[in-house]
Amino acid sequence: MRTTRRQAFIARTRLAAAAVNATVDLHIAPDVVIGRDVRVTFDPRSRNVLQIGPQSRLEDRVLVQLKGGTIRIGDRVQIRRDCVLNVAGELTVEGDSPISWGSIIHCSTRIHLERMVGLAEQVTLADSSHFFTEPDAHFWHNVRTGSIEIGRNTWLCPKVTVTRDVKIGSHCIIGAGSVVVGEVPTGSLASGVPATFRPLPLPW
């Protein structure tokens, strides 16, 4: 009986965890589609969770980096080519979501995408940032974190960046190239650097 790509992915993932004395609670629905060169890496001795729900898809060259984190991907989620999920916290994608080519998610604490959230090409979500303290102290060692929440049926256009401590409501559109640094109310169109918002003329 031929080994499917999904079965090979599960075996490789378990071996990658064992190689660095990490653990992974792994649940991959039977009909999940795994592309070519999809990789999962683990921090040594970390404890991790990876769940992928029914009818979801990880396309070619997706990289998942688990650093003692939890990833819960619901049903009918498409993670397209060359995306990166770098997770030390808790990442939840509820379902019915496209995450398009080259998008990057850095999750240190908590990132939650409600159903039907869409990320276009090269979107970045990062719930942490670095800062300076003194001239000879490396900025990389100083980290601030804060969760990201994105509401139902919200669309992030290409090359949007969402920073820490951000809540975006439902039925929003975030314009291409925008940087979101604060709260965006439900039913808003937001754009710019930093993004400002105005009401979206919704048909209801």
What are these regions (language model features)?
Residues 8-11, 16-22, 29, 88, ...:
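A sequence-composition feature that detects small, non-aromatic residues
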Residues 31, 147, 187:
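A residue-level signal for beta-strand positions that form part of recognition/binding surfaces
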Residues 38-166, 193-204:
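Flexible, glycine/small-residue-enriched loop-and-beta-strand segment within the central core
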Residues 167-191, 195:
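C-terminal/domain-terminus segments
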